[in-house]
């Protein structure tokens, strides 16, 4: 039996997983999102569940540890964050919602109940749309319906020690504000689920209401799954996206296997299962379901809103990522989907160097400055140049040199960056020389060689380092350089592969050698055209 389970788990979580047409998958998600408010939900304790991890019970107040006589005071910042998310998800906001007590006993919940919104949630009936182009799903678009959003408090954390049988309780996380978002069972494949989680993470980060990190527990996902309308199975203990998808794969195959063996009767009762990392295991069934004895919380007044408040908050919500992404792919920007996503997807990987708000602002300002400069000097406007240089060249240098974008903007503001782009588009300097110039400026700034108050003189730097593009080079000179490279390379196989089209990109290697010889002062396109002509490759 043990061997069967191991092989079964390995087979289920493999890359060949497939939803069978005769066994239809229906999934819904329950997502708990920690809000990054300044204080906790019902107390003035600092809301820093991931800070001071070596100091358990440090960020706590009398209410957080349930000292008798203490009462909850609602944090209005949490209400504001919930309202922003509700509006972004197009939910119907309840103008009169209230809190309820969910009773159960566990060590990390010293109150003996959790304050949540069971009977009258904060908002309901929303949706989040997924797109084929933006989210890599199979359908042209897919609407995922949101049943409700509710505000509730997080629990403390149980810490297990393997050296003894004691369980320790850390209440730093106790009373941290949460939003629980529940979807309809609208998901029918894994691509939709992955896309939704990624988009929801991006949304809460964009609204600046949560870090959205699964790994730290700032966002926690439970899955409700059924096959062919058998009873719902809830999957818990899913710490990251791979766990979520692997647990669904395993559970889908487990249930299909049971149905095919004639054991479908065992799937007629609602069940909660946990994910161990290799298989799902039963936690409880409908027969052992907990009676939480919900009741309205008598110590908290209702949350009363007005249409004017809702409309006022709606005006403060920034343009949503999907709208920004689509705008960037249209005129006048014309970006590729990949570049547009880089400017709109909010990840936490580079927070110490730049925020995506700063990155977008840098792009838009530089784009406008470059466009104005081209118009003023009657030069050709190359619309993709700002994105190419900000996303690929500037960010690459910032990450390598670990320089914050906000500091670079002091010496290389959008107007100055636009000057550099104009020098490149006018072919005053080549792309390669432009890269050297940008790298030199950033490196000099890092080493305090540049003073922010003194504007950069690009022409002086070009003269100093002899970076002027060679514009009067003839075709014969280009051919001599290219022919010498082909001869010295002495690699007939590579040349034949380029000619036959088997390895077209190998010509980039030849161009790189030519750029090295010319010290980057001749445009790479000139060399590429010459190589293709010499080798008889279609341009």
From Swiss-Prot:
Pfam families registered for this protein in UniProt: GatB_N, GatB_Yqey
Listed GO CC annotations: glutamyl-tRNA(Gln) amidotransferase complex; mitochondrion
Subcellular locations according to the entry: Mitochondrion
A molecular function (GO) term: glutaminyl-tRNA synthase (glutamine-hydrolyzing) activity
EC number: 6.3.5.-
GO BP, sorted A to Z: glutaminyl-tRNAGln biosynthesis via transamidation; mitochondrial translation
Coiled-coil parts of chain: none
Entry superkingdom: Eukaryota
Keywords: ATP-binding, Ligase, Mitochondrion, Nucleotide-binding, Protein biosynthesis
Main location: mitochondrion
Reactions catalysed: L-glutamyl-tRNA(Gln) + L-glutamine + ATP + H2O = L-glutaminyl-tRNA(Gln) + L-glutamate + ADP + phosphate + H(+)
Keyword Mitochondrion: yes
Misc. comment: This protein may be expected to contain an N-terminal transit peptide but none has been predicted.
Assembly and binders: Subunit of the heterotrimeric GatFAB amidotransferase (AdT) complex, composed of A, B and F subunits.
PANTHER family in UniProt: GLUTAMYL-TRNA GLN AMIDOTRANSFERASE SUBUNIT B MITOCHONDRIAL AND PROKARYOTIC PET112-RELATED, GLUTAMYL-TRNA(GLN) AMIDOTRANSFERASE SUBUNIT B, MITOCHONDRIAL
Family: Belongs to the GatB/GatE family. GatB subfamily.
Biological role stated in the UniProt entry: Allows the formation of correctly charged Gln-tRNA(Gln) through the transamidation of misacylated Glu-tRNA(Gln) in the mitochondria. The reaction takes place in the presence of glutamine and ATP through an activated gamma-phospho-Glu-tRNA(Gln).
Protein name in the entry: Glutamyl-tRNA(Gln) amidotransferase subunit B, mitochondrial
Organism name: Kluyveromyces lactis (strain ATCC 8585 / CBS 2359 / DSM 70799 / NBRC 1267 / NRRL Y-1140 / WM37) (Yeast)
């Amino acid at each position: 039996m043990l061997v069967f389970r191991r092989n079964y788990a390995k087979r289920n979580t493999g890359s060949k997983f497939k939803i069978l047409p005769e066994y239809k998958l229906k999934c819904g998600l329950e997502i708990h999102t920690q809000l990054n408010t300044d204080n906790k939900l019902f107390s003035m304790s600092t809301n820093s569940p991931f800070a001071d991890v070596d100091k358990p019970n440090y960020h706590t107040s009398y209410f957080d540890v349930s000292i008798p006589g203490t009462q909850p005071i609602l944090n209005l910042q949490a209400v504001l964050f919930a309202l922003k998310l509700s509006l972004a998800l197009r939910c119907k906001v309840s103008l009169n919602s209230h809190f309820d007590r969910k009773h159960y006993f566990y060590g990390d919940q010293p109150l003996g109940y959790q304050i949540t919104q069971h009977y009258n949630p904060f908002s309901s009936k929303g949706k989040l749309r997924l797109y084929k182009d933006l989210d890599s799903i199979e359908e042209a678009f897919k609407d995922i319906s949101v049943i409700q959003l509710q505000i509730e408090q997080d629990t403390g954390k149980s810490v297990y020690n393997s050296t003894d049988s004691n369980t320790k309780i850390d209440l730093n996380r106790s009373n941290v504000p949460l939003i629980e978002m529940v979807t309809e069972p609208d998901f029918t494949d894994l691509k939709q689920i992955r896309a939704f989680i990624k988009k929801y993470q991006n949304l809460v980060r964009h609204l600046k209401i949560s870090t959205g990190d699964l790994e730290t527990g700032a966002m926690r996902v439970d899955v409700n799954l059924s096959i062919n309308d058998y009873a719902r199975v809830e999957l818990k203990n899913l710490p990251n996206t791979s766990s979520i998808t692997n647990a669904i794969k395993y559970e889908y195959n487990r249930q299909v296997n049971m149905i095919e063996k004639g054991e479908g009767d065992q799937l007629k009762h609602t069940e909660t299962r946990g994910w161990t990392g290799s298989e799902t295991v039963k936690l409880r069934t409908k027969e052992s379901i907990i009676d939480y004895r919900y009741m309205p919380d008598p110590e908290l007044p209702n949350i009363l809103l007005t249409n004017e408040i809702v409309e006022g908050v709606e005006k403060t919500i920034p343009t949503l990522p999907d709208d920004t992404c689509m705008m960037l792919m249209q005129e006048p920007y014309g970006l590729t989907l990949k570049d547009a996503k880089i400017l709109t997807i909010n990840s936490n990987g580079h927070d110490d160097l730049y925020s995506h708000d700063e990155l977008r602002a840098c792009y838009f300002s530089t784009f406008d400055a470059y466009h104005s400069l081209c118009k003023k000097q009657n030069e050709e406007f190359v619309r993709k140049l700002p994105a190419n240089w900000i996303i690929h060249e500037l960010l690459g240098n910032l990450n390598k040199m670990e320089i914050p974008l906000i500091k670079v903007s002091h010496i290389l503001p959008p107007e100055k960056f636009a000057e550099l782009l104009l020098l490149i588009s006018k072919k005053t300097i080549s792309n390669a020389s432009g890269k050297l110039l940008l790298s030199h400026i950033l490196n000099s700034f890092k080493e305090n060689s540049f003073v922010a108050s003194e504007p950069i003189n690009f022409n002086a730097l070009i003269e100093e380092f002899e970076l002027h593009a060679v514009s009067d080079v003839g075709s014969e000179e280009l051919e001599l350089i290219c022919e010498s490279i082909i001869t010295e390379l002495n690699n007939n196989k590579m040349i034949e592969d380029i000619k036959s089209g088997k390895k077209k990109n190998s010509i980039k290697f030849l161009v790189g050698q030519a750029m090295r010889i010319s010290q980057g002062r001749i445009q790479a396109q000139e060399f590429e055209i010459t190589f293709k002509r010499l080798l008889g490759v279609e341009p």
